[in-house]
Amino acid sequence: MKESVIRKLEGLLERNEEVMALLGDASVISDQDRFRALSKEYAQLEDVVAGFKAYQQAQVDLDSAKEMLEEDDAEMREMAQEEMKAAKAKLEHLEDELQILLLPKDPDDDKNAFVEIRAGAGGDEAAIFAGDLFRMYSRYAEANRWQIEIMSCNEGEHGGFKEVIMKVSGDGVYGKLKFESGGHRVQRVPETESQGRVHTSAVTVVVLHEVPEAEAISINPADLKVDTFRSSGAGGQHVNKTDSAIRITHIPTGIVVECQDQRSQHKNRAQAMSVLAARIQAVEDEKRRSAEESTRRSLVASGDRSERVRTYNFPQGRVSEHRINLTLYRLNEVMEGDLDAILLPLMQEHQADQLAALADEQG
């Protein structure tokens, strides 16, 4: 392993010990914000510190085995050869693992996310599939113990959604769900299809990270056009009878956000503003990314909403993830929320991209 990497790991080991000592300090324990921040840092350091300690131990084992080679006993020398082989293999494996753990973390990965699902080409069938995707993400969130809140929805005439925006809150939400941005295509026979023909429909998914108030871009109230209107769609006895729904237009960017899920105009406005802040931030992030990646574009994590990322073929029970040429014949499980089967390979591919970029920079 390179000396510069060893020095970095030694620095992290030292920092881990400092944080551990601070967490036992009475003044830190009494300061909840500081204690929470240090606990989070300690958790983030845990894997890399454990990996480096294992690496150091493997290095000690290798050195001991080398010393054993000097022994006169033939059996001892043979044992030393085997131990050297095992230690070298372990060092190689741990080095790869540590390289990944040292990759720069996206500071937004730990944030909550807004997931926007919109029916595209395909009419009623697209809206029904948008509803299926909403259910899939809800199941996945449930499995991860994340919380879901519907920010806005426009229901389809025959089920599903023309558009639905959900907020997903919990640990590491954006870091996983950001890979879902893009075009999702479905191929299946609609219930209304009497000839049994397979129809193709499309749904667009956009995943934005939540922008905490402290980090939010300043939005000039003069740049906003706010309209109120009566909520539409299903609601039964709870349907809004007042003009509590809100539509906010950000004039400089043309971004429009509607929220009508809450019965209070004040709550709808607050939700609309949080979605608006996330969309404006996404525009700024995209500008920055374009500048940074002008020489090299990461296909996996680009999140280009116009790009077709996945196809769900119901007659064949097949899911095809186009960005990494992954095909799984377990469509039912995926639709029930088993998304890790797709997301983990995507994350690994993204890490491989980052490692390649790092090698280019160092080379």
Curated annotation (Swiss-Prot):
GO MF annotations in UniProt: translation release factor activity, codon specific
Highest rank taxon of the organism: Bacteria
Keyword list, A-Z: Cytoplasm, Methylation, Protein biosynthesis
Composition skew (Basic and acidic residues), residue ranges: 284-296
Residues that bear N5-methylglutamine: 237
Processing and modification events after translation: Methylated by PrmC. Methylation increases the termination efficiency of RF1.
Pfam families associated with the record: PCRF, RF-1
Region of interest (Disordered), residue spans: 284-305
Record's subcellular location: Cytoplasm
SMART domains according to UniProt: PCRF
Family designation: Belongs to the prokaryotic/mitochondrial release factor family.
Functional description taken from the UniProt entry: Peptide chain release factor 1 directs the termination of translation in response to the peptide chain termination codons UAG and UAA.
Protein name: Peptide chain release factor 1
Biological source species: Shewanella baltica (strain OS195)
